[in-house]
Amino acid sequence: STGWVDPFTHFCDPGYEHRETLATGAAAAQAGGFTTVFVVPNTQPVIDNKSQVNYIVQQNHQLPIHVLPIGALSKKIEGKDLAEMIDMHQSGAVASSDGLYPVQSTLLFLKALQYVKTFDGVVIQMPIDKSLGSLGLMNEGITSTQLGLPGIPAIAEELMIARDIELLKYTNSKLHITGVSTAKGIALIEAGKKAGLALTCSVTPYHLYFNETDLNTYDTLLKVYPPLRTKADQAALLAAVENGVVDCISSHHQPQDWDGKTIEFEYAKAGIASIETSYATINQLLPQLNDEKIANLFSNNARQIFNLPSKSIQEGQSVELTFFNRQEVITKSKSYSKSKSANSPFWDKALKGKVIGTFSKGHLHLNTEA
């Protein structure tokens, strides 16, 4: 396949290098088969101006794969004033988003959608209305009641998706919704696409693999945001990947240190370091997808949506390739992880699908161990 692209990862650098650095994140991404990743701006300092974009662009020269910055949509990702989006675009930002902090202000989001049109940019939004279930720890429903945990209702996602689609219609801009977790959310996106909007979406491997009932042991490794939803939601997401409503897989790779996960569920940090097992998870769940569909989900669609070079094999062009085996069953152990953080429920799980290696920036890299 042409080199895989992950459009939503958190490499924690600068500011939180104890959890991940650009170098360790890039190594983990490469092990996972990715030759291009987008990093969210939720760093310290925030990627909200061209000098912060330049930091990532400069660091990228030393890395084995392409690590591209997503420029913040608002200053300091506070959701109040627009950041210098044009400056960041010109300096190399690949998209505009507040990353892990979805934009709550309708006016600001409207302005952002209008603003990116000047440079044919794309806004990425993780859809959660934070005023609903703001203290929630998991999906709101029977399971949350049984476990005695406060919930985040599905409607918090659905309202945000509905709002953002209406704003997209109004502005005729480009929007990518990532981390969709509900059946109704996916249905709204499908309707928006049928209406001809420049609307695309991605889901995470873990929303496809797990559901809320997996939380019955209070496993903090499964504390994620957006939360794991119902079995019916999970089935709807899997169907949407199969039928093409979902454009891409984004790992939402979010490293957390040991202290952030080995505490009570209520206080544990959200997120999974999922980039190394992203492909195997999808291949395990959806073996019926043909090779072309896998290539579209992991590479071609993202390249098209975000105006990246196609990197396919053409005379005189540089190529990016990912080599993968769909039949081999692998069991990744934590000790072989390239990431700085080991917060993943996928370690020691037998998953069908192996990344053999990548060809990126003129170098062939073969994965030597599981």
Go through each PLM region and give its residues:
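His/Asp/Glu-enriched, well-ordered alpha-helical/loop segment
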Residues: 146-172, 242-243, 247-249, 254-324
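Histidine/acidic residue-rich metal-binding segments in metalloenzymes
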Residues: 83-249
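Short, acidic/polar
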Residues: 18-26, 77-87, 163-164
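A glycine-rich helix N-cap at a beta->alpha junction
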Residues: 58-73
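Metal-associated gating/positioning segment near the N- to mid-region
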Residues: 1-60
